[in-house]
Swiss-Prot record:
Gene name of the record: amiD
InterPro entries (UniProt xref): BP-dependent_transpt_permease (IPR050366), MetI-like (IPR000515), MetI-like_sf (IPR035906), OppC_N (IPR025966), OppC_permease (IPR054864)
GO cellular component, as recorded: plasma membrane
Official protein name in the record: Oligopeptide transport system permease protein AmiD
Keyword Mitochondrion recorded: no
Transmembrane segments: 43-63, 111-131, 145-167, 171-193, 234-254, 274-294
PANTHER family noted in UniProt: OLIGOPEPTIDE TRANSPORT SYSTEM PERMEASE PROTEIN AMID, OLIGOPEPTIDE TRANSPORT SYSTEM PERMEASE PROTEIN APPC
Keywords (A to Z) from UniProt: Cell membrane, Membrane, Peptide transport, Protein transport, Transmembrane, Transmembrane helix, Transport
Length: 308
């Protein structure tokens, strides 16, 4: 039979206060989100690309004297169709205009349209969805509206509206925002129905807590990851909408640069002077891809179930 070596043990006094001490670090939701978000290498790479594109798109045009409609050099053959070099990084087109300037002016407009349309749709969708989820009378009406609108392809609605009201910056944003928000509202409504009747919400309602306060304090914080996921899907989608519509002459006016407009204008250069077509297209792909990857990683990180 083995014996216990008493020298390996030490008697200590009982300390009730020490036994109640919590040694685990305090949990911070947003710190955990940031930690999970930056853990992935794809986040760092794509976030770097996205930040660089956004900074150049919004800062460079402030100091450039670029005029998208300038054709004064059309007869100066010495500045036409210059391939990318140290002086003209992206080359020049048939009018002698710098493609570098055109790409960043166009990227700024495309990103602005996407961000503004996304914010408008999210604000309306979350607000209406919150009311939709807690009001049975509103639910009956909105379900009928949703059933009608959801059967029409969103892109078709945008095309019809832009064709009807004409090309323009705010016209395009209006067309993107007329009905798109209803899909977000329906998703918020479904999520609220999941959480509305949980025990702690029933207890709050029994104690007399106002319904709107329950939604704002108890339910909406649970939907952060869902809202972020929706936002990440909308941003690249609206950029693609703008590019598609501008390519067919339905988006921005021909006098306003955008990535879609540049791709449309230089589509005949796919085989000759191909850089005019591929550089704007590559920029569009980089913007959309970086937005999607960064957004998806942020949505995953905002889900508390992924936190450790």
């Amino acid at each position: 039979m083995s014996t216990i070596d008493k020298e390996k043990f030490q008697f200590v006094k009982r300390d009730d206060f020490a036994s109640e001490t919590i040694d685990a670090p305090a949990y911070s939701y947003w710190k955990s989100v940031f930690k999970q978000f930056m853990k992935k290498k794809s986040t760092v790479v794509m976030l770097g690309i996205l930040v660089a594109i956004i900074l150049i798109s919004f800062i460079y045009p402030m100091f450039s004297k670029f005029d998208f409609n300038d054709v004064s050099k059309v007869n100066d053959f010495s500045v036409r169709y210059i391939k990318p070099n140290a002086e003209h990084w992206f080359g020049t087109d048939s009018n002698g205009k710098s493609l570098f300037d055109g790409v960043w002016f166009g990227a700024r407009n495309s990103i602005l349209i996407s961000v503004i349309a996304t914010v408008i749709n999210l604000v309306i969708g979350v607000f209406v969805g919150g009311i939709w989820g807690i009001s049975k009378s509103v639910d009956r009406v909105m379900m009928e509206v949703y059933n009608v609108i959801s059967n029409i392809p969103p892109l078709l609605i945008v095309i019809v509206l832009t064709y009807s009201i004409g090309a323009g910056f705010w016209n395009l944003i209006f067309a993107m925002s007329v009905t798109t928000w209803i899909g977000i509202a329906f998703m918020i409504r479904v999520q609220i129905l999941r959480y509305r009747d949980l025990e702690y919400n029933l207890a709050s309602r029994t104690l007399g807590t106002p319904t709107l306060k329950i939604v704002a304090k108890n339910i909406m914080p649970q939907l952060v990851s869902v809202i972020v996921t929706t936002m990440t899907q909308m941003l690249p989608s609206f950029i693609s909408y703008e590019a598609f519509l501008s390519f067919f002459g339905l988006g921005l006016p021909i006098t306003v640069p955008s990535l879609g407009r540049l791709i449309s204008d230089y589509s005949q250069n796919v085989t000759t002077n191909a850089y005019l077509f591929w550089i704007p297209l590559t920029t569009l792909v980089l913007v959309s891809l970086s937005l999607f990857v960064v957004g998806q990683n942020l949505a995953d990180a905002s889900d508390p179930r992924t936190h450790r």
